[in-house]
Amino acid sequence: MALWRLSVLCGAREGRALFLRTPVVRPALVSAFLQDRPAQGWCGTQHIHLSPSHHSGSKAASLHWTGERVVSVLLLGLIPAAYLNPCSAMDYSLAATLTLHSHWGIGQVVTDYVHGDAVQKAAKTGLLVLSAFTFAGLCYFNYHDVGICKAVAMLWKL
């Protein structure tokens, strides 16, 4: 009954439901040709914007993505190198790359799942504080204790 009322309000004839006469999903090839043209909506027209936003093609985003990949590849080589040659240079390199890798990864989770400007800004500020304390704590551990590499080796001996 509710669908019939809705279809009558939106102009469907003889009780036909609106979704039966209007395709909801269009193939990608058809949608590509219909960019920024009005499409029939529930009650009138709505604009479908399939083109990417103006900010998504920025150079900064591309460099950030490249930086994330470089850090990930560095970690693939740095972890075995730290196992084979544990020293303070490896400890500090691990502290920096692990903190940066974690910061960027959790930052993407915040961007994807935290909604609202104020809440997202607070979450990103909290993440920045957490990352700073993580890096400072790892550096403190490297300077005043055995370091990351030897600590992991000691854990493996247990």
UniProtKB/Swiss-Prot annotation:
Family from the record: Belongs to the CybS family.
Residues binding heme b, per UniProt: H101
Binding annotation for a ubiquinone: Y113
GO process annotations (BP): mitochondrial electron transport, succinate to ubiquinone; tricarboxylic acid cycle
Function: Membrane-anchoring subunit of succinate dehydrogenase (SDH) that is involved in complex II of the mitochondrial electron transport chain and is responsible for transferring electrons from succinate to ubiquinone (coenzyme Q). SDH also oxidizes malate to the non-canonical enol form of oxaloacetate, enol-oxaloacetate. Enol-oxaloacetate, which is a potent inhibitor of the succinate dehydrogenase activity, is further isomerized into keto-oxaloacetate.
Pathway annotation: Carbohydrate metabolism; tricarboxylic acid cycle
GO annotation, cellular component aspect: mitochondrial inner membrane; respiratory chain complex II (succinate dehydrogenase)
Assembly mode: Component of complex II composed of four subunits: the flavoprotein (FP) SDHA, iron-sulfur protein (IP) SDHB, and a cytochrome b560 composed of SDHC and SDHD.
Residues of the transit peptide: 1-55
One Gene Ontology MF term: metal ion binding
Naturally occurring in which organism (per UniProt): Bos taurus (Bovine)
Claim: Transferase is one of the keywords in the record: no
Classification via CDD domains: SQR_TypeC_CybS
Membrane topology: Multi-pass membrane protein
Protein name: Succinate dehydrogenase [ubiquinone] cytochrome b small subunit, mitochondrial
Gene: SDHD
Keyword rRNA-binding attributed: no
Subcellular location(s) per record: Mitochondrion inner membrane
TM ranges: 63-84, 90-110, 120-141
Mitochondrial matrix side: 56-62, 111-119
Mitochondrial intermembrane side: 85-89, 142-158
